């Protein structure tokens, strides 16, 4: 395995000593979140979604293309209002109510 110059700084290692550490830390945080595993809204599988363009994402498993955030597939506001998430929460609440009775 070749020597890696980005072991500590992560994806921002490609910038070398340029742009300052603060900006490189921000870039690293964004890119780690962007390239991590996310749940597909269609097939619900946990995969690395492909970013096709600014805010457009595709699931490599099922091929579902959807609009999301610029840097992450689902924004905080979108996650709060996603119908799939609300259905899961309602189902969980119903299970808890039945368990209490």
UniProtKB/Swiss-Prot annotation:
A zinc finger (C4-type) spans 40-62. GO terms for molecular function: large ribosomal subunit rRNA binding; structural constituent of ribosome; zinc ion binding. Zn(2+) binds at residues 40, 43, 59, 62. InterPro entries: Ribosomal_eL37/eL43 (IPR011331), Ribosomal_eL43 (IPR002674), Ribosomal_protein_eL43 (IPR050522), Ribosomal_zn-bd (IPR011332). GO terms for biological process: translation. Binds 1 zinc ion per subunit. Keywords: Metal-binding, Ribonucleoprotein, Ribosomal protein, RNA-binding, rRNA-binding, Zinc, Zinc-finger. GO terms for cellular component: ribonucleoprotein complex; ribosome. Binds to the 23S rRNA. HAMAP family: Ribosomal_eL43 (MF_00327). This is Large ribosomal subunit protein eL43. It comes from Pyrobaculum aerophilum (strain ATCC 51768 / DSM 7523 / JCM 9630 / CIP 104966 / NBRC 100827 / IM2).
């Amino acid at each position: 395995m070749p020597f890696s110059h980005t072991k500590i700084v992560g994806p921002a290692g490609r910038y070398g000593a340029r742009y300052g550490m603060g900006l490189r830390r921000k870039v690293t945080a964004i890119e780690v979140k962007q390239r991590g595993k996310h749940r597909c809204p269609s097939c619900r599988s946990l995969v690395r979604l492909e970013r096709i363009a600014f805010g457009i994402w595709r699931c490599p498993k099922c091929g579902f293309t959807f609009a999301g955030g610029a840097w992450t597939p689902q924004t905080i506001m979108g996650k709060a209002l996603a119908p799939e998430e609300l259905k899961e929460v309602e189902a969980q609440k119903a299970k808890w109510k039945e368990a209490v009775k």
